[in-house]
């Protein structure tokens, strides 16, 4: 009789919720609006904006005629207005907008319940921008918001009416339409190309597979990119972004310098993601390797690019994609072709958890933001307390407070705060389902 192991085995993790609504594979996910909304995109071009409190759709529409490569959602005015950026295999990058009042009239029938013969154009959000971009690479777009003063300058230079432009001023990186190894940078709301990062002339990298924009604290723009031959690179643009001319009259080319190049993978790179601090990034590939890379700062001109990764591990699990780092920079997750979601430590790259529920391969993951609540908790602590000597009304105030605590409004607020404080990890699969996990 074998001796029993003294180690207590923990039960396997199970998802907290399953969101069923897509009829095709989930390719893009993002949690936004202080963790109250989740936006998802599938292989049929459908977008669903979910309410994470009720776990029901707030808006559904067919954004593209092809697969959705990436989707990003943002809320403005404390949720009064929502903008959704979508990138499809139909070679379109689109920006959609709807207000809180519009949500009542928007279509909420989920894609899995919509008949193919029914109209897909009704009750859509307002299409603000539609840019023709390259989508042959399977490379999703990356975006950064411009600093406020730079955004104002760019907006002043645009002749488009304010109501016909996006609420935000952003730079967007996509693969070049003519050279699949080059990267184009576009500006919104101007809807024009600002510059191009040329393909590497020393080696044949193949197509751009992933890109990520980041602005340093000093205002310099960096682009981390990954390629078909397994290489990853970092390019930096010398000079603060504030000094760049984004107007339509610009003739001065942006000067990009290659700061880092490393062939960390033997297969095409599937994804990369830059840390919240902007000082490193992770890459994943069709092989089993995960790599952590530096983002070197711009040194003296002509300095040779760095070539050594910070750390590289062989996970023995090929085909991990959709790598995402959580907002606190402590953990990151990958979506696996083997249907498993894996969670790793950012510091040690040690595997912390393997989440299995889906039967088919997973393509996308998304984290909830975990650092937006310190401000709210601090503001709650700073609320004035009731003095026991205030006009002798302490008893009445306590009674009123007790009544308020059990009011429907308070219950509603508590539901919202519970959702906002949950450390969600969302995973999207080929089966069209989205699993929500509460971990770490």
Curated annotation (Swiss-Prot):
- Would the keyword Repeat turn up in this protein's UniProt record? yes
Q: Which UniProt keywords apply?
A: Chromatin regulator, Nucleus, Repeat, WD repeat
- Gene Ontology biological process: chromatin organization
Q: Which SMART domains match?
A: WD40
Any one GO CC term of this protein is: nucleus
List the Pfam families: WD40
Q: What residues form the membrane-spanning segments?
A: none
Give compartment(s): Nucleus
Q: What is its main location?
A: nucleus
InterPro entries to which the protein is assigned, alphabetical? WD40/YVTN_repeat-like_dom_sf (IPR015943), WD40_repeat_CS (IPR019775), WD40_repeat_dom_sf (IPR036322), WD40_rpt (IPR001680)
WD repeat segments run: 21-60, 66-107, 205-245, 264-303, 315-354, 406-440
User: What SUPFAM superfamilies does the annotation carry?
Assistant: WD40 repeat-like
Family per record: Belongs to the WD repeat ASA1 family.
Assembly and partners are described as:
Component of the ASTRA chromatin remodeling machinery complex.
Q: What does this protein do?
A: Component of the ASTRA complex involved in chromatin remodeling.
What is the name attached to this protein's record?
ASTRA-associated protein 1
Organism, scientific name: Aspergillus niger (strain ATCC MYA-4892 / CBS 513.88 / FGSC A1513)
Gene that produces this protein? asa1
